[in-house]
Amino acid sequence: GLRNFSNIVQSERQHQRAVQGLLQTYRLTDPTAGKRAGEFTDPEFTQLYQQLVTQGARSNVDALKVGALIEELDIADLNQLTRQTQRADIKWVYTNLNRGSRNHLRSFDMTLKRQSGASAYQPQHLSQAEYDAIVYSAPERGGMGGMGGMGGMGGMGAGRGAGGGRW
């Protein structure tokens, strides 16, 4: 298998803890509670999930493209969500989730280039300039370990999927 995915699974657990911390802080119900992977309240998300799983199962290159797409969606969503809140704790979590998604996108991009050439993935939700600025920059350090057990999140469909299911 591809190491990209096993590494990201570990960071996703930490990312889920960060979001759980915010849900607890603000006494919000977890919209993913009791749901299996791919189960969403919104049928549009269920359809997207099924489409991406099918696409990613075709080959390693397709799986990497799906991973890049999900990270790209997360980055676009997190950029918007960060602009929409004034709460420092929420901004902090979103900023760290976004950093994780940028690092994951770099990883997918680098592996795609190794496996299939320089133009393997074309961004769909970020401009080419935004995408290039991310993938041609150094991996970012930081993290979420210092905030009361909060972790980080990218790759889960942070804005799009978090409202109704599990990726």
Q: What are the residue ranges of the model-derived segments?
A:
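All-alpha RGS (Regulator of G-protein Signaling) helical domain and cognate RGS-like helical scaffolds
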Residues: 1-167
